[in-house]
Amino acid sequence: MADWSTLPVDLLNMIAGRLFSNIELKRFRSICRSWRSSVPGAGKKNPFRTRPLILLNPNPNKPLTDHRRRGEFLSRSAFFRVTLSSSPSQGWLIKSDVDVSSGKLHLLDPLSRLPMEHSRKRVDLSEFTITEIREAYQVHDWRTRKETRPIFKRVALVKDKEGDNQVLGIRSTGKMMYWDIKTWKAKEEGYEFSDIIVHKGQTYALDSIGIVYWIRSDLKFIRFGPLVGDWTGDRRLVECCGEFYIVERLVGESTWKRKADDTGYEYAKTVGFKVYKFDDEQGKMMEVKSLGDKAFVIATDTCFSVLAHEFYGCLENAIYFTDDTMIKVFKLDNGNGSSIETTIYPYAQSCFQMFVPSFL
């Protein structure tokens, strides 16, 4: 067996330079003493230092050290694939964010940002292999640590032409906004957008009638690709195997849901999905009948794809989503799928098993 502790420092530096996140770096440095000493941990030279808090302060005259400010900040969450080190072939999907005051990780419901119910207060990470697979953002109020009102249904952190961070967000009304140092400003007045995604370092937005736009580094919008048919439901962008897809949620008639406090809200039940992909040869969007061995995860703040066999219970050719806070799955089955409705916690051995880690 090879002695991994004798690998040359130059090679270890090359490996470390290809790691994705701070968690992977910690795992790398825990292998042995020579690996730990080859790459810095905490400090200025750490390639994955804690991200600085991005503050969105509407009153620039107030000092940013004033914790009573009525400002906003960009809240980052991340999705992880977690496997037992002794059994790495399959794992669970978890989501977490970081408390801006304590720096501690909070586990969240994977398809929303609601706190996840669990009995364990601490988890020994040395027993697991953890890989970050996706990040997502929301704009939160500094005082409440909750979403701002009106809310942003989608938020993206992008690079402008100077290489600096720029925050783009889509309001619940569909209006595209960007943060201009002092205030939020609207982009592309008269248009309504449904999603935004960073794909291969480029930013794309999807409007409410199914047109995809490329957003340049100077925040100019350029139409990219043809219209995706008639609008019939909510549409999202999903990256899969280096390409992006458009997922359309089909909804039925709205019904009125009553809460325990006698208030109510309008709720449209999901009845199906359609998936589209741009066909270069035909120059148009084509409906996709099968996702193969992939599954799409449609969270409230981002979307992404996974290899089904890498997660416990995950179905191939399926779309996981929430409907009125309930996790469901939709099998495409050549375009003739059916939705499975359930609460996930009684079903730890079912197709929702990947959302219920056995160690929590």
From Swiss-Prot:
The name under which this protein is listed is Putative F-box protein At1g65770
Annotated F-box domain residues: 2-50
**InterPro entries hit by this protein:** KIB1-4_b-propeller, SCF_F-box_domain
One BP term from GO:
negative regulation of L-ascorbic acid biosynthetic process
Pfam families with a match to the protein in the record:
Beta-prop_KIB1-4
